């Protein structure tokens, strides 16, 4: 199992002799609009708070998240990024058998493997545009004594998403704990696809979110989990460090979730840019482009005249980075993923890709 994170900009920029800001990174799935201006100003205005320990209860941060997600503050757990909560939850549950919706993010399998867990993978199929039939998925879960089901929603890298109605059906018709990673949920219609409002009614549901992607803050390492399961909450909290969220992350979090202007503008802009990229990429006769509810798009080189790794190298020479997806189990060397950047950058990507396919 290989890692399927985005590009390491520090390493790439060093090798190319460039500044990180000179690279157009279509591989990392981070909001190109940056982070909330109000949240950054709050950090500046309160910079002297670094001399004080954070509130160990994180009352104001949890209240901000509660209002944002519509969940009770008592059902919120905080983590140093979503990855810490993924690790903590799987470690606490210590499953013997798990269902993993695949292909997907490598950290899930990595953490499940640490528990010596038998992993039953349900592979979505390209023939179905990577869409998952909820009844087939439920039958797969129930076909074995699985302790836990891991779902990335929307799924990275395929872009498929279960609606919250489908997620409720999964919860009602299975016995396993359900872990849903909603890292990319804000890039789609949360009223249709987010399951946060199911948390208070289903104590077998554990939702994980991070602020790295939509809120453009990978550097502050802030994530949160939502569950009404008291045993899970108490077990995870007892295993986390007392002050696992630093002061700057706390200040930003208290403000960013209330910045409605940033949230609305990001959603509208990136939805529009995703549709632009989907339309333009779909016009390439060499590509099969898969629908997406995330801020990224999975494409397959159906003509097989060139591999994704070769396209990546050509683009890299032009300071453009895309994601070669062969490290995702279930995908081959002809799949690549791009995320949405600003319109000029997206247009340049399309123009450059056209020149590559014309010359092949």
Functional labels for PLM-detected ranges:
Residues 54, 66-88:
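Short loop-beta-helix segment that forms the pyridoxal 5′-phosphate
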Residues 91-147, 151:
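PLP-dependent aminotransferase-like
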């Amino acid at each position: 199992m290989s890692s399927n994170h985005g590009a390491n900009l520090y390493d790439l920029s060093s090798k190319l002799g460039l500044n990180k800001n000179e690279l157009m990174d279509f591989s990392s799935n981070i909001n190109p609009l940056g982070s909330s201006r109000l949240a950054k100003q709050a950090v500046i205005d309160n910079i002297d708070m670094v001399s004080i320990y954070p509130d160990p209860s994180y009352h104001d941060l949890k209240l901000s998240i509660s209002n944002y997600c519509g969940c009770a503050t008592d059902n919120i757990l905080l983590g140093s990024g979503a990855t810490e909560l993924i690790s903590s939850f799987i470690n606490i549950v210590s499953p013997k058998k798990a269902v993993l919706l695949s292909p997907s993010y490598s950290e899930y399998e990595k953490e499940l493997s640490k528990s010596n867990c038998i992993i039953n993978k349900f592979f979505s199929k390209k023939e179905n545009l990577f869409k998952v039939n909820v009844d087939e998925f439920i039958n797969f879960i129930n076909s074995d004594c699985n302790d836990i089901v891991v779902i990335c929603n929307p799924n990275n890298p395929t872009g498929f998403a279960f609606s919250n109605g489908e997620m409720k059906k999964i919860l009602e018709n299975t016995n396993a704990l359900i872990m849903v990673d909603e890292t990319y949920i804000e890039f789609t219609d949360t009223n249709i696809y987010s399951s946060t409002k199911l948390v208070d009614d289903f104590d077998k549901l554990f939702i994980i979110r991070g602020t790295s992607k939509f809120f453009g803050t990978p550097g502050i390492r802030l994530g949160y989990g939502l569950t009404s399961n008291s045993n899970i909450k108490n077990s995870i909290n007892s295993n986390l460090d007392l002050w696992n969220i630093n002061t700057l992350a706390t200040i930003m979090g208290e403000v960013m979730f209330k910045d409605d202007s940033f949230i609305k503008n990001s959603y509208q802009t990136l939805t529009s840019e995703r549709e632009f990229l989907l339309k333009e990429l779909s016009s390439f006769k060499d590509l099969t482009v898969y629908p997406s509810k995330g801020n990224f798009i999975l494409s397959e080189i159906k003509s097989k005249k060139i591999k994704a790794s070769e396209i990546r190298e050509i683009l890299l020479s032009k300071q453009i980075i895309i994601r070669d997806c062969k490290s995702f189990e279930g995908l081959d060397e002809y799949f690549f993923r791009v995320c949405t950047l600003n319109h000029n950058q997206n247009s340049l990507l399309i123009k450059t890709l056209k020149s590559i396919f014309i010359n092949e």
